[in-house]
Amino acid sequence: MQAEVRIERYADQGRCVAHIDGRVVFVRFALPDELVRVELDEPHDRDDRFWTGEVVEVLEPSVDRVTPAWPLAGPLAMGGGVGGADLVHVSLPGQLKWKAITVSEQMSRLGHIDVAVPIERMPGDKAAGGLNWRTRIEMIADDNGMPSMRRRGTHNRVAIDTMPLATRTLLDVAKREHVWEGGFEPGSQIRLSVPEPRGEIVDTAAADDNYAVLVDGELRAGSQLLTEQVTINGTTF
């Protein structure tokens, strides 16, 4: 079932709120004030407290809307659906606004504290376009043994040959360890973890080996023990 709705406000999990005949609908890949056409998730019953759905067409876009930097993670109707990037359709300033409003609303609703919560980007994030920040990724091998991700709401696996959200260090490890070349048993769980150095790296040799590639829980490359390091106000932890 499809419906045309006016999006009202931000919600959680990268969704926004709209109403259909008085019922709350949580909509993926939408933005406040937009007029969109939504495909409702099945099943949806009239007795349900709320419905969920996803944008299939944007009739009146928000100024904060952008073309998804990673199309595979965008709406199903636009060739996406692999998940992992809930705000892929939102500009960088729009993402900050979304998060600031959401956190402030939760502080008010749960903590009864009315305060505007500032949200700031980490150094270098703007230059990276909001990408290259994940230090861990998980995939599943498709029927051809290639790393893939499941399309949302299905068992379909979509082969991938990169992960734009992953740090450049993680992507370098994946390339060096031939992860994108496949050769895995179909259905295998593939996990990569590469802690990102923050602050001064004291032991460079240890940092070079500070990663793990696991297949079905077994270490294929790297180290069993990983070290996370961060420097705050001059103190390294």
Which residues does each PLM region occupy?
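Accessory RNA-recognition modules of RNA-modification enzymes
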Residues: 1-237
